[in-house]
């Protein structure tokens, strides 16, 4: 690939975006950028520093002091791999509050776009195809039922040894769907030119094959 390639994958929480984006990234030699993990990193640091979502000025100063980049598909914050920390339930419950702040989104979107100017990238999130990479070469919107997404998250966390309750995860996903879809700034929605894929019951590799078939045309 001589010219830079950009791929946008959007969808609600637990639709399989990050797993699928990683595989597609490896297959097509694209840098995988998990934008959700960047918002989770902000949430992690805000909670550690007792900065509420209402304290926007403090949040922006905090973000300006955060050095974020990706190594082997994992987020490195100020020299530390924080991937195990940002997938904890407490972060999942609070991330929507911080991610809905206009100034926070502007800061992080600017950083994401700079990455896409340097490398061929695949990004997943809520507003990649509609906001971050409006001119992406390929746009996909992944969906799945709330129950299926809760089951995936439950198994993922239990597999990591985290004791969680399925019903709590399901309610959290339903709540996050509502917040993400109804927030004032850059709500979750499918880009008009995105290809929608329902991942319910298909399996990861089935979705990868579908996306690959579009990209190889």
From Swiss-Prot:
GO terms for molecular function: ATP binding; CMP kinase activity; dCMP kinase activity. Keywords: ATP-binding, Cytoplasm, Kinase, Nucleotide-binding, Transferase. One of its GO terms (cellular component) is cytosol. It is an enzyme of class 2 (transferase). Its EC number is 2.7.4.25. It holds the Pfam family Cytidylate_kin. It comes from the Bacteria. InterPro entries: Cytidylate_kin (IPR003136), Cytidylate_kinase_dom (IPR011994), P-loop_NTPase (IPR027417). CDD domains: CMPK. It catalyses: CMP + ATP = CDP + ADP; dCMP + ATP = dCDP + ADP. ATP binds at residues 11-19. One of its GO terms (biological process) is pyrimidine nucleotide metabolic process. It is found in: Cytoplasm. Belongs to the cytidylate kinase family. Type 1 subfamily. This is Cytidylate kinase. It comes from Clostridium perfringens (strain 13 / Type A). The gene is cmk.
């Amino acid at each position: 690939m001589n010219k830079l390639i950009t791929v946008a994958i959007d969808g609600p929480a637990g639709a399989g975006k990050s797993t699928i984006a990683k595989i597609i990234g490896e297959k097509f030699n694209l840098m995988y950028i998990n934008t959700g993990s960047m918002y989770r990193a902000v949430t992690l640091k805000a909670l550690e520093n007792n900065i509420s979502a209402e304290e926007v000025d403090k949040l922006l100063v905090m973000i300006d002091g955060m050095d974020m980049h990706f190594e082997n598909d994992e987020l490195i914050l100020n020299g530390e791999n924080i991937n195990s920390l940002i997938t904890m339930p407490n972060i999942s419950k609070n991330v929507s509050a911080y991610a809905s702040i206009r100034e926070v989104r502007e800061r992080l979107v600017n950083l994401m776009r700079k990455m896409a100017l340097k490398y061929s990238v695949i990004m997943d999130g809520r507003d990649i195809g509609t906001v971050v990479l409006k001119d992406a070469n390929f746009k996909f919107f992944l969906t799945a039922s709330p129950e299926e997404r809760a089951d995936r998250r439950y198994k993922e966390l239990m597999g990591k040894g985290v004791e969680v309750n399925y019903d709590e995860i399901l309610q959290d996903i339903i709540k996050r769907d509502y917040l993400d879809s109804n927030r004032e700034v850059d709500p979750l929605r499918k880009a008009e030119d995105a290809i929608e894929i329902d991942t319910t019951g298909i399996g990861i590799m089935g979705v990868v094959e579908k996306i690959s078939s579009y990209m190889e045309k």
